[in-house]
């Protein structure tokens, strides 16, 4: 990683969680949550444990909202939104588009977001008051104004088995009116790559 968090206490925790995810890449167990295609691995759970432990240690009054655990209520209006492994299906299939995400909410409003691209070793930071950065360098979104030329990133929700036909109709309309569609399996990285001018929307 080429930079540190503004909230530096969590820097080592993110690196430790990322190392754990890498180390477990060829030795993990998989379970399904609400849907057959909504997976969780023991790597998700171990990475989450590392992040929650660090937040509890350094920011004991902050709340924690994590994908795999019960919510910890805040006593000061600050909460951390955690996804310890965004792109679990990718991870389970040895596709290296996965990320750790941390978002700081103040009075339920996001003010800072950190996304660590584990296998590319890139840190994306977003701030409500000063924009987005990749490895400390300011990002510039696309200047493309033509929808017909725009490259769009998208994904399908986990309830696609129930609403698949509706999603396909929407997807078809996007295909017909844009320059192309890409789907990489990590919503967090899709957003970061949009901020980094890899996608137009």
Give names to the regions the model predicted.
Residues 140-201:
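An extended, acidic
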Residues 1-85, 169:
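N-terminal subdomain of lithium-sensitive/metallo-dependent phosphomonoesterases centered on the IMPase/IPPase/PAP
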Residues 21, 44, 55, 88, ...:
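Residue-level signal for inorganic ion chemistry
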């Amino acid at each position: 990683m080429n930079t540190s968090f503004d909230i530096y206490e969590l820097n080592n925790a993110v690196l430790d969680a990322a190392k754990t995810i890498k180390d477990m890449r060829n030795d993990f167990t998989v379970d399904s949550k609400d849907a057959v295609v909504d997976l969780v691995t023991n790597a998700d759970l171990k990475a989450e444990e590392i992040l929650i432990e660090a937040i509890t240690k350094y920011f004991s009054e902050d709340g924690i909202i994590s994908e795999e655990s019960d919510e910890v209520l805040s006593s000061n209006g600050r909460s951390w939104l955690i996804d310890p492994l965004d792109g679990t299906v990718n991870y389970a299939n040895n596709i290296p588009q996965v990320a750790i995400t941390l978002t700081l909410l103040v009075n339920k409003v996001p003010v800072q977001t950190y996304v660590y691209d584990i296998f590319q070793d890139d840190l994306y930071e977003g701030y409500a008051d000063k924009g987005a950065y990749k490895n400390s360098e300011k990002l510039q979104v696309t200047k493309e104004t033509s929808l017909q030329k725009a490259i769009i990133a998208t994904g399908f929700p986990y309830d696609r088995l129930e609403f698949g036909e509706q999603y396909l109709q929407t997807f078809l309309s996007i295909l017909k009116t844009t320059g192309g569609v890409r789907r990489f399996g990590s919503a967090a990285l899709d957003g970061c790559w949009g901020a980094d001018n890899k996608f137009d929307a």
